[in-house]
């Protein structure tokens, strides 16, 4: 057996045989989008309906990808993720998008809605939103 450093040619061949051409790949990715879209819509509508206008968090509505980037009040992200975990919602670690996971503002949370079912996401979003509200209230009162 000879091992080389470089592209996995056999895997590339599998992809070419499966997708046939760029149009085949685009069609396949549309199927992924059809599966993911309702999941993202569930989370985004929960954020908008419950946190919109409160000025305790902001988020980006992605146009592709697998994550929603949420920014809390500074100093709250780790506490929000911990509070959600207490209620049974396991999330990506706060600050995971930063090198070594060290968010200098402790404000960024990456939400990954691709795995849970839409029903689970609805409940998880409700818990996340409540966690954001509770931690934000504590932070605002602490800063007064």
Ranges and model annotations:
Residues 1-50:
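PLP-dependent aminotransferase class I/II
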Residues 2-6, 33-34, 56, 70-72, ...:
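Short, contiguous acidic/charged loop-to-helix segments that flank catalytic cores in large enzymes
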Residues 9, 86, 102-144:
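PLP-dependent enzyme catalytic core of the Aspartate aminotransferase-like
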Residues 16-22, 70-76, 125-129, 133-136, ...:
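Glycine/serine-rich loop-strand microenvironments at binding/catalytic pocket rims
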Residues 30-44, 56-71:
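Conserved glycine-rich beta-strand-loop-beta hairpin in the small C-terminal domain of fold type I
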Residues 67-110, 118, 123:
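Conserved C-terminal alpha-helix-loop-beta "cap" of PLP-dependent enzymes
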């Amino acid at each position: 057996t000879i091992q080389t450093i470089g592209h996995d040619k056999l895997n590339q061949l599998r992809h070419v045989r499966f997708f046939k051409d760029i149009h085949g790949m685009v069609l396949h990715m549309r199927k992924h989008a059809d599966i993911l879209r309702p999941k993202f819509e569930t989370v985004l509508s929960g954020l908008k309906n419950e946190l919109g206008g409160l000025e305790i968090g902001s988020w980006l509505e992605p146009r592709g990808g697998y994550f929603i980037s949420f920014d809390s009040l500074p100093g709250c992200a780790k506490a929000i993720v911990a509070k959600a975990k207490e209620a049974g919602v396991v999330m990506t670690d706060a600050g995971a998008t930063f090198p070594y996971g060290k968010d200098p503002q402790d404000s960024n949370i990456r939400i990954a809605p691709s795995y849970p079912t839409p029903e689970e996401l609805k409940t998880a979003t409700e818990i996340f939103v409540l966690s954001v509200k509770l931690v934000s209230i504590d932070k605002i009162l602490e800063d007064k």
